Curated annotation (Swiss-Prot):
The keyword Ribosomal protein applies. Belongs to the bacterial ribosomal protein bL25 family. CTC subfamily. Part of the 50S ribosomal subunit; part of the 5S rRNA/L5/L18/L25 subcomplex. Contacts the 5S rRNA. Binds to the 5S rRNA independently of L5 and L18. This is Large ribosomal subunit protein bL25. Residues 185-205 are annotated as: Disordered. Disulfide bonds: none annotated. Keywords: Ribonucleoprotein, Ribosomal protein, RNA-binding, rRNA-binding. One of its GO terms (molecular function) is 5S rRNA binding. Residues 186-205 have a biased composition (Low complexity). InterPro entries: Rbsml_bL25/Gln-tRNA_synth_N (IPR020056), Ribosomal_bL25/Gln-tRNA_synth (IPR011035), Ribosomal_bL25_b-dom (IPR020057), Ribosomal_bL25_C (IPR037121), Ribosomal_bL25_long (IPR001021), Ribosomal_bL25_short (IPR020055), Ribosomal_L25_dom (IPR029751), Ribosomal_uL5_bac-type (IPR020930). GO terms for cellular component: cytosolic large ribosomal subunit. The gene is rplY. It comes from the Bacteria. This is one of the proteins that binds to the 5S RNA in the ribosome where it forms part of the central protuberance.
């Protein structure tokens, strides 16, 4: 995914405000052997790019002054109540160095899972992304979670997923976290309990 930016020579609160008023967003690219570089981007193009999932979890081709660098989106700051991107950070990546990135999960075959189709349950997404470690060339845009065989009451764990080649999940202490489950809707559980209580009542003499 290509991102076009321009070198920025001035900094400070006043300069950033003037930049935003002209339809630009200040930013920075850092990391690697090169020095951090101040940049500016077209605000509207950046705003639309931020709505794309791939912009957050892909290696970007960041073009600055005609030169292209591989980079990751690392952070962005939004205005508290206006639809305005205040600042954006990119990190350079090297083809030979592993990176840590959060990758979104795509849940597949939810409607056809036995626990949903036959058991009338709901699929619960316990996590929606996973932090992974891999080389830039191995970074997936997303990881598939196939829940098509899940039964009512079943939980899918990390060990049940088929990870792309070269990708390792960073679990931060929990070696096999839960990813998804299928359970009955809360209302259905309450109705079933009430029905059981009513059936067990003995009419007064």
């Amino acid at each position: 995914m290509k991102v076009v930016a321009f070198e920025r020579s001035v900094q400070g609160t006043g300069a950033s405000r003037r930049l935003r008023n002209s339809g630009k967003t200040p930013g920075i690219i850092y990391g690697g052997a090169a020095e951090p570089k101040m940049i500016e981007l077209d605000h509207n193009a950046l705003w639309h790019a931020l709505k794309k999932e791939a912009f957050h979890s892909s290696i970007l081709d960041l073009e600055v002054a005609g030169k292209s660098e591989k980079a990751l989106l690392r952070a962005f700051q939004m205005h508290p109540f206006k639809p305005l991107v205040l600042h954006v950070d990119f990190q350079r990546v090297s083809a030979n160095d592993k990176i840590h990135v959060k990758v979104p999960l795509h849940f597949m075959n939810q409607e056809t899972a036995p626990g949903v189709k036959l058991g009338h349950g709901l699929v619960n997404h316990i996590v929606n992304d996973l932090e992974v470690s891999c080389l830039p060339a191995d970074l997936p845009e997303f990881i598939e979670v196939d829940v098509g065989a899940m039964e009512l009451g079943q939980t899918l764990h990390l060990s049940d997923l088929k990870l792309p080649k070269g990708v390792t999940v960073i679990t931060h202490g929990d070696d096999n976290p839960a990813i998804a489950s299928i359970s009955q809707p809360a209302g259905a559980v309450s109705e079933a309990a009430e029905g059981g209580e009513a059936a067990g009542e003995t009419p007064a003499a």
